[in-house]
Amino acid sequence: MSWRSESIWIELRTGSRKTSNFFWAFILFLGSLGFLLVGTSSYLGRNVISLFPSQQIIFFPQGIVMSFYGIAGLFISCYLWCTILWNVGSGYDLFDRKEGIVRIFRWGFPGKSRRIFLRFLMKDIQSIRIEVKEGISARRVLYMEIRGQGAIPLIRTDENFTTREIEQKAAELAYFLRVPIEVF
């Protein structure tokens, strides 16, 4: 989502609160809970859940491995739910032509650098760079090249934009900032 006027452009960035992240965190939680319950059932020698008999699974080595996978899956699921809760990666890009300043804000993980805030002068922007890699794992990234700072990604790699959409966004941003476009 974005908002534009003649001198200001604000681009809101979605973080980890995407439908796919909710889906995978939920599926991973259910799957790992199932593995842990089957491993626990094989250790106790009786069914904790009645969906399938776990007496056929002996504790050593299958029950131990299933318990380990269940615990590992619960930790990964907990990590995913925490990133969703904290909305890691969300924020905004603000381009202000009147003041000549670019502000980039993102939420990070809790701690010292929870708030990631970058500020640049517009005159330090060298170009808008598009990196397109086609193939099985297609990658389309939009960067802002800053003098003395290097390239700063503006669009995440997991946002599934087509090449045309990336080019359109790069052209609009380059026109707004009055800088050239580089394609890699």
Swiss-Prot record:
Signal sequence annotation: none
GO cellular component: a single term: photosystem I
Record's keyword annotation contains Transport: no
Topology of the protein relative to the lipid bilayer: Multi-pass membrane protein
InterPro entries named among the record's database cross-references: PSI_Ycf4_assembly
Localisation: Plastid, Chloroplast thylakoid membrane
Regions crossing the membrane: 22-42, 57-77
Main subcellular localisation: plastid
GO biological process, one term: photosynthesis
Family of the protein in this entry: Belongs to the Ycf4 family.
HAMAP family: Ycf4
Protein function: Seems to be required for the assembly of the photosystem I complex.
Name of this chain's protein: Photosystem I assembly protein Ycf4
